[in-house]
Amino acid sequence: MRTALSLTVFLCVAPLHAAEQKLVHEGVVDAPVDAVWKAFTTKEGIESWMVAKGEIELKIGGKMRSVYDAKAVLGGPQTIENTILSFEPGRMLSIKNTKAPEGFAHAEAIKNMWSVIYFDEAGPVRTRLRIVGLGFGEDEASQQLRKHFDWGNAYTLKKLQEHFAKQGK
């Protein structure tokens, strides 16, 4: 029988230097690391739980493009484009937004931000996922972006947990 979803959210802010500010979301997913890795790093994976349409080129400098609206055109104005900065297969993925969707309120602030996603075994069929957002400044625009990702990353983690919980039933 599957265990209940568990979600632990940690927020860490280093007040001394803007460069040290980070946003951390962490939780356990009821699936092995390999399955969670594929859910984040393959077209089939991201389209199964995260986005309506997507594509990913898993390589340094590769693009991860997606849209949330099934009616939107991938490559059109609503496309979100992230560039892969680095990765260690099955362990870590770092990305930076290189194209925000048209009308995104934080388009300037996001230029300084990047995310690192860690995948760690938390048991034979469980994965501890840790999403770290970095590059937030002390200015108002950057703090608004931070709030946006605080909600968004928590939501993303919850959706991933729900996706695998449904598969386990």
Where are these regions (language model features)?
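Positively charged n-region of N-terminal signal peptides that target proteins for export
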Residues: M1-L5
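Hydrophobic h-region of N-terminal signal peptides that target proteins for export
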Residues: V9-H17
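Hydrophobic ligand-binding cavity/cleft-lining segments
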Residues: L16-K59
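Hydrophobic/aromatic beta-strand elements that line small-molecule binding cavities or substrate pockets
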Residues: H25-G27, K53, T79-S86, N112-E121
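A short, structured loop/turn motif at beta-sheet edges
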Residues: D30-D34, L58, L85-L93, Y118-R128, ...
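Hydrophobic pocket/interface hotspot
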Residues: V36-W37, I46, M64-S66, I84, ...
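Short beta-edge strand/loop motif at the mouth of beta-sheet-based domains
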Residues: E44-T79, F87
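Beta-strand/loop substructures that line and gate deep hydrophobic ligand-binding cavities in soluble
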Residues: F104-W151
